[in-house]
Amino acid sequence: MHEDSKMSGLKFLLVTALNALITIVELLGGIFSGSLALLSDAFHNLGDSASVVLAYVASRIGLKNSDPSKTFGYRRAEIIAAFINAIFLIVVSAFLVIESIRRLLNPAPVDGGIMLVVAIVGTLANFVSAWLLSRGAKSNLNLKATYLHILSDALSSFGIIIGAIIIQIWQIDIIDPIVTILVSVYIVWETWPVLKEAINILMQAAPNLDFEAMKADMLKEPGVVNVHHIHAWQIDENRIMFSAHINLNDQLLSDVEPIYRHLESLLQKKYHVDHVTLQAEVFRGKSNELFTRDQHDI
């Protein structure tokens, strides 16, 4: 694991402390101002605190070496954490939209002054937290999900500032639930790709590889007659696993090993596959297709 894609203990402590502070400030601010946007953001930040803890624990578990019970290691722990965080974000966003619609149907007065001050504090703290997590978020799905949690809160708080100014100047209280709805829609828009990628990895969906081109390149190796029974999946967002059956001319095992090495080098260098497993055959499966469709022969 690269250190720049992990939360250090200090970052974890700072982000958690900032989120706890924001939660308390926004909860009190929401109660005293009557702002649904602040109250919803407070609960959102509370969820963020839990997501940061979950992400940190998962990143530590992911550092564990493989063992007889987890032969591929523990990297999937971070994918599971990303999945949970993404689901939580979408559920919270849906709840906020429902509550905002209720507030639109039954408007309530909002103290724009308190709302503005609290939103400014929340925005600054959230942007600091997002900055702390930004390093490594591009290459780590777990950190990306957590980073999106915090960034969505920062944008939410910024939206609340705009809403508070409008309420303070023009007394348009209805802007409070409207801002909440807009921010919630944005959160779902940003979170959906993370959820989709996490589901694909957990379901062992094939990565974006050109399998026909891979087969064509493998068939160029002298002695390779056919390639079939291909499987490709990802352990995490960075590591691709690949297995295939290859039909070879009948020859000594000592002559097969150089073919293995050449094919492994090809797949690793050209297609960025991290782990290659090849099964050599002579007659079995010689006319089979690239992919098996038999559920009993996966």
Predicted regions and their residues:
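Alpha-helical transmembrane segments and adjacent TM-loop junctions that form the membrane-embedded core
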Residues: 1-14, 37-39, 43, 51-298
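Short, hydrophobic transmembrane alpha-helix segments
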Residues: 28-39
